[in-house]
């Protein structure tokens, strides 16, 4: 079973949704960007991340634009379910840009990152360095198309922060603003076969028939396939090492000096 929700901005009250009570071990909640729970590196924040990582289901997110990329990039990268992820804590992971996964028996193409609406207001060189990290690199764009092509340009679900350019007019009527990520996702739209595309950023919940969903604070079931109940993996106890008994000292005959 896979559920999807939108921008969190560090607000974990979304996890109280009754929908999530249906999720089992091996299922997943996917967040479409602006996770925002990796922000200042405080002890409280680390406790929150540990708590989310202890959920029985997988908590997965693509990055948006309101993230602390310096902190996020410190987490280790590892292969998981077919694609690269950043392991945050336990069952909490970042799905990386342009990666392809098999999650809860469904295929998912993920593409996080975007262009902040505040970019034009940055004045300091350091600010520019920060927002550049929001943007996908040419290598990530190319890798995304290559990964899709490797899987016959087919996925059950596409998860992105930005919408494809063609969807913007259905969300913001009269808006002509586009960026190169929107245009790139249009290319994905033209080549990929998929069941549903979820994206965030716009802070509204809106279905664009037949296969596109702009999502914000709703928690929706993308796939309700019930996986068999999985047993919690048992912690392996370290094997006890048997202590060797010391050899018994032999007595010597006082007269001969020989050992008895």
Predicted feature residues:
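Beta-strand-turn-beta hairpins that frame and shape the catalytic cleft
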Residues: 1-3, 99-110, 157, 209-213
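Core catalytic region of metal-dependent phosphoesterases/phosphodiesterases
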Residues: 5, 10-103, 174, 181-185, ...
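Short, solvent-exposed loop/turn segments at secondary-structure junctions
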Residues: 9-10, 36-38, 66-68, 113-117, ...
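Short aromatic-enriched loop/helix-cap "lid" or pocket-rim segments at secondary-structure transitions
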Residues: 43, 73-75, 120-123, 170-172, ...
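Active-site-proximal loop/helix segment associated with metal-binding centers of metalloenzymes
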Residues: 90, 104-176
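Active-site donor-binding loop signature of nucleotide-sugar glycosyltransferases
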Residues: 97, 113, 128, 217-219
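Binuclear metal-dependent phosphoesterase catalytic core
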Residues: 102, 186-191, 202-260
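Proline-aspartate-enriched helix->loop->beta-strand connector
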Residues: 155, 159-160, 193-194, 198-199
